[in-house]
Curated annotation (Swiss-Prot):
It catalyses: RH + ROOH = ROH + ROH. This is Probable peroxygenase 7. The lineage of its organism: Eukaryota, Viridiplantae, Streptophyta, Embryophyta, Tracheophyta. Heme binds at H33. The modification Phosphoserine is found at S188. GO terms for molecular function: lipase activity; metal ion binding; plant seed peroxygenase activity. Its EC number is 1.11.2.3.
Length: 210
């Protein structure tokens, strides 16, 4: 076999990685959380992908559209330091740690990594009715405790995030379990909810068939 043939075979076996694609094993918890909305996995989240992500989770069209506009317009510039304005409002997943807001739980550190002690603090401080779950009222009290009166944007963002989370992931008793809250931080809950919704839709279609 000639050297040229070996070289060609080597190239065929080692395709170049897709531009912007991230190595999931090396991603921080926050990057994994954000990457759920990177529907084509190119390392960038556009407004229509944010919309598609929220629709996949089961939100209505109007809410998904509003959230997509709010998130991408608000975070795009922060995740693209040194780059010019883009009317497409892209969010760079690898720089998602640059858009963390105040008035939150501090479960992510400055680099977007998961902080176990801060996570445990949520339930140690605020889970009064059940040690491993939060009621809607307890979530409201937690948000009030974390709120910085001079950080309106951060408080509104945190309120919206927890409101949507509770709506999508609460159990039949209206409780948000510790397991679900933990899974939201690395985005694994998103995948679980999408899979569950997809399965329900498939069963519904089968039942409608004559």
């Amino acid at each position: 076999m000639s050297h040229q043939t070996v070289a060609l075979a080597s190239k065929a076996k080692s395709p170049k990685p897709k531009r912007g694609k991230l190595d999931k094993e090396k991603m921080t918890a926050l990057e994994k959380h954000v990457s759920f909305f990177d529907r084509n996995k190119d390392g960038t989240v556009y407004p229509w992908e944010t919309y598609q992500g929220f629709r996949a989770l089961g939100t209505g069209r109007l809410l998904a559209a509003f959230v997509a506009i709010f998130i991408n317009m608000g975070l795009s510039k922060k995740t693209r330091p040194g780059k010019g304005f883009s009317p497409l409002f892209p969010i760079d997943v690898k720089n998602s740690h640059l858009c963390m807001h105040g008035s939150d739980t501090d479960v992510y550190d400055d680099d977007g990594r998961f902080v176990e002690s801060k996570f445990e603090e949520i339930f140690n401080k605020h889970a009064r009715t059940h040690k491993d779950a939060l009621t809607a009222e307890e979530i409201q009290k937690m948000l009030k405790t974390n709120r910085d009166p001079f950080d309106i944007t951060g408080w509104l963002s945190d309120y919206g995030e927890w409101k949507i989370l509770h709506t999508l992931a609460q159990d039949k008793n209206g409780l948000l379990s510790e397991k679900s809250v933990r899974a939201i931080y690395d985005g694994s809950l998103f995948h679980q909810l999408e899979k569950k919704r997809s399965s329900s839709s498939s069963r519904g279609k089968k039942q409608k068939l004559p």
